[in-house]
Amino acid sequence: MKNIHCINHPLIEHKLGILRAKETKPFQFRMLIDEISSFLLFEASKDFSLKEIEISTPIQKTTVKKLDEKIMICPILRAALGMLESVFKMIPDASVGFLGFVRNEETLKADFYFQKLPKDAKKRTAIVIDPMFATGGTAIEACNFLKSQGVKKIKFISILAAPQGLKKFSQMHDDVEVFVACIDEGLNEKGYIIPGLGDAGDRVFNTL
């Protein structure tokens, strides 16, 4: 699966260990989600195009480089809201396109209930964020929708992923690069990532 990138880094592994622990408090959990998301964004943005512009330093004029892509961050509600601020800090000029999915606990499929994209979405590079990449259903439907709206370039960032979901996704969207901090063992009978970290949304918003 050439489109799947698992980012190996000692600091990511250290932070993941704390993130997984059930004793980790909500404010710590949010901070760790934010920090790990920043690492993943660095990797996902390596091929972003740049343009040269002329500026004046306090000493003289010089040529510098500036991002030459219009970015749209697409958080999948609600858990991905915990990742949004870290991406905004790195790309403050980005627009946000919200995608709402709710998991059907009987079928384990993702039901699409809300979307709000910028008017120029088709001209933007989409960075879809969702902390958990489990069955792949939500990721597939999110990319299906974005492509139906004319979005040409999509990247996906997740904290944890299950191999089953990544394989299924790659079969449907091999043109979408996925960046994850860790690929876990798999899924349990309820479709949750194991060993995982629990319900990311509940832990971010302290609704356990």
From Swiss-Prot:
Keyword list (alphabetical) reads: Allosteric enzyme, Glycosyltransferase, GTP-binding, Magnesium, Nucleotide-binding, Transferase
Q: Name one GO molecular function term.
A: GTP binding
Q: What does this gene product do? A: Catalyzes the conversion of uracil and 5-phospho-alpha-D-ribose 1-diphosphate (PRPP) to UMP and diphosphate.
Instruction: Quote the protein name from its UniProt record.
Output: Uracil phosphoribosyltransferase
InterPro entries xrefs: PRibTrfase_dom, PRTase-like, Upp_B, UPRTase/APRTase, Ura_phspho_trans
Catalyzed reactions:
UMP + diphosphate = 5-phospho-alpha-D-ribose 1-diphosphate + uracil
Co-factor note (free text): Binds 1 Mg(2+) ion per subunit. The magnesium is bound as Mg-PRPP.
Q: How is its activity regulated?
A: Allosterically activated by GTP.
* Chain positions recorded as 5-phospho-alpha-D-ribose 1-diphosphate binding sites: 78, 103, 130-138, 199
Q: Name one Pfam family in it.
A: UPRTase
Q: Which cofactor does it need?
A: Mg(2+)
State where uracil binds: 193, 198-200
Is Glycosyltransferase a UniProt keyword of this protein?
Answer: yes
> Which E.C. number(s) belong to this protein?
2.4.2.9
Q: In which pathway does it act?
A: Pyrimidine metabolism; UMP biosynthesis via salvage pathway; UMP from uracil: step 1/1
Disulfide linkage:
none
**Family statement:** Belongs to the UPRTase family.
Q: Which GO terms describe its biological process?
A: UMP salvage; uracil salvage
